[in-house]
Amino acid sequence: LHEGLSVSMEEAIRMNASAVAFSIMVGAEFERDTLLAFSQLVDDAERYGMPTLAVTAVGKGLERDSRYLGLASRIAGELGARIVKTYYCDNFEHITSTCPVPVVIAGGKKVPESDALDIAYKAVQAGAAGVDMGRNIFQSESPVAMVQAVRAVVHENATGAEAFEMYKDLK
């Protein structure tokens, strides 16, 4: 992944964006480039009071484990991200306890609703501030019910099983 900016800060403001996001790749061929570009984005965003979300990933050959994702998340926070999005993994509490800013989990690949809700619950219990799900919401049989179930996990401390029951009742 060799990512660059797709819109300027002025364009983001014109679009009434609430935040800007950028992917950083630790251990990848273009690690240095993504970190420098992210640092520049943070500087630009801070001039306008725009929060920055860092989306963390690791290079090919590196496992999505707490060691590497934790390093990527901590680097993102130290470079000025206001919030970090990363993948859920074993020992997730290592990531949340070493990152200086709130961490949310990426939704990842499409999984059954009960599994997505269990992962969300485990992540929140391990210190995640929330979840950033895409396909596990919009590819759900009932996206509205899934959003409400995820909300129950994040804001009402519902377990994955309780949230799945809510999902089934609402769909």
Residue ranges of model-derived segments:
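Substrate-binding cleft of secreted/luminal carbohydrate-active enzymes
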Residues: 128-130, 138-143
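A short, acidic, flexible beta-alpha connecting loop/helix-capping segment that sits on the rim
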Residues: 135-139, 168
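C-terminal accessory extensions appended to soluble enzyme cores
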Residues: 162-171
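Histidine/acidic-residue-rich catalytic or RNA/ligand-binding cores of hydrolases
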Residues: 115-117, 141-150
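Alpha/beta enzyme core
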Residues: 1-105, 110-133, 152, 158-163
